[in-house]
Amino acid sequence: MAKQIKFEFKDKAYTLEYTRKSVETMEKRGFKLSDISDKPMSVLPDLFAGAFLAHHKFEKREVIDEIFSGLRNRDELFSTLVDMYNEPIVALMSEPDDDEGNVTWTVQ
C-alpha cells in the first residue's frame, strides 16, 4: 500500500497520497520533479499541492497554500513527499510477481 500523510485542518480531515493517475495529471500539467534543484520555489509547493489530487482534487489552491504556509518540519515533509511521489513510478516499472497470464515479448 502506498504511503499516506494524514492531518486535520480547520476541522476537515485530509489524506495526501500519490497514485498513478495523480502523478500522470501532474506530469500533464508540466510538473517535473527533476526541476526541484533549479526551481524550488515553484516545484516544492506544486509537489505538495499534487498530493491532494488523489483524495481532494477539488480543494482550492488557496486552502492548500494556507495549509502549506502553516506546516512544520518541511525538510522531512518534502523528503517524504518525494518518496511518496516516486512510489507509483516504481510500481509501474516493477515486474509482475507471477508469470501466469503475463505477456512476453521479443525483438526481431
Task: Enumerate the predicted regions with their spans.
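Charged interaction scaffolds used for protein-protein
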Residues: 1-9, 13, 21-24, 29-38, ...
